[in-house]
């Protein structure tokens, strides 16, 4: 009878993030959508095709009225930063967005605190860009002929 060939099992180390040298940053894109009702922080790769992590302010607090608060946005941003570090992302380009269209062009309360929390948690910030959709000419805005009277 012939002998069986015994294969040595080799253990390979698998990392989640890309292989980079020390001191080199791996960039992702953080898309922060801050409306008056909630704050979304959505991190993708540079092409925007693959979602790495997506957390909202509503996932962090229980009360509905607190979803858009700066505190909820800060908690969401801290979670995003820890998850990005696990995946090997060390730096982020920021795309900040308000509701836009024929609604408000001003970002909500959570935008600034989310950005600050990302920076304080050790993520390097690349470019900050405002991507709020602004219409060249749009449909009629909500409210009557004379506007909203207070």
UniProtKB/Swiss-Prot annotation:
Recorded GO MF terms: structural constituent of ribosome
The annotated region (Disordered) lies at 130-150
Asked whether the keyword Magnesium is assigned, the reply is: no
Where does this protein have compositionally biased stretches of type Basic residues? 141-150
Which processes are annotated in GO (biological process)? translation
List the Pfam families. Answer: Ribosomal_S11
Q: Does the keyword Ribosomal protein apply?
A: yes
InterPro entries documented for this protein: Ribosomal_uS11 (IPR001971), Ribosomal_uS11_CS (IPR018102), Ribosomal_uS11_sf (IPR036967)
Among Gene3D superfamilies, the record links this protein to:
Ribosomal protein S11
Q: Where is it found, in Gene Ontology cellular component terms?
A: ribonucleoprotein complex; ribosome
Q: Tell me where on the tree of life, at the top rank, the source sits.
A: Eukaryota
Q: Which UniProt keywords apply?
A: Ribonucleoprotein, Ribosomal protein
PANTHER family according to UniProt: 40S RIBOSOMAL PROTEIN S14/30S RIBOSOMAL PROTEIN S11
Query: Mind telling me which HAMAP family this protein's record contains?
Result: Ribosomal_uS11 (MF_01310)
Q: Which family does it belong to?
A: Belongs to the universal ribosomal protein uS11 family.
What name does UniProt use for this protein? Small ribosomal subunit protein uS11
**Organism field:** Lupinus luteus
- Record gene name: RPS14
